[in-house]
Amino acid sequence: MALVHGHGTLTLAVIATAVWWLAVTIGIIGGAALLRTPDGSPVDRYGIPNGLTALRGYACVPVLLLGTLSLPGRLGLALWGCIGGSVGLLDAVDGIIARRYGPVTVLGKAMDPFGDALYFVVGAIGSWALGIVPLWLAILIVARYAGPVVLTPIVLLTGRRPELVYTVWGRRNTLFTGVVLFALYVVRLFGGPVEVVALIIALPTLVPTALLHFVALFQRVAASPRAG
């Protein structure tokens, strides 16, 4: 990176990564109060599932830099698939471990959707920068994942206390998003028509599931109790 962009860019990248890692660490430590099971029993450790979710959080800025800073030849595309894709797969692994081996915690239920939101936003931006997805699809993915994160504080300020967990359609949309991004990565890798393939596979899968996810979120908010 230093050879391509200069030492100044490398220094800024290191600083940005360090600041981000500090912010993630503070968030994880601050969330220790939520280390309890959904039925209220205290948990004395973060556990592997929460650790894997945290790892995705730590990886966001390095992966974003990997996608947006040009590298020689097809190196950026190759690293994006190897590193970005591998970290993204942790989303499936942490849930499986939590359900099978535990611990399932309130912290994990809150962190996992938030971690997904961060990582898929990074994935959308990096994929667009690398020519893996068209702009409209990147915007759709960013809106789908950033929207609930941005709206959650507003909902809480109204006094509503909805459960901060996935919706069924949100899980389905996340699965489809991962499949679409992988398919388009392969198309881009072999020089195929990314725009055409995106229209064929993303429109009928991501658009309706994203809309149904937001409908489910609004219904959850409307049915949620008020604080106090």
Task: Write out the residue ranges for each language-model feature.
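Membrane-interface helix/loop boundary segments of multi-pass membrane proteins
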Residues: 95-103
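Hydrophobic membrane-targeting signal helices
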Residues: 65-68, 85, 89, 128-129, ...
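Membrane-helix interface segments
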Residues: 73-79, 107, 132-136, 193-194
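A feature for the membrane-embedded catalytic helix bundles of lipid/isoprenoid biosynthetic enzymes
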Residues: 1-53, 57, 113-228
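Hydrophobic transmembrane alpha-helices
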Residues: 82-90, 143-146
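Amphipathic cytosolic juxtamembrane alpha-helices at the membrane-cytosol interface
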Residues: 103-109
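Conserved G/P- and acidic residue-centered "switch" motifs that form tight phosphate/ATP-binding loops
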Residues: 91, 112
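Hydrophobic alpha-helical segments and helix pairs
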Residues: 41-83
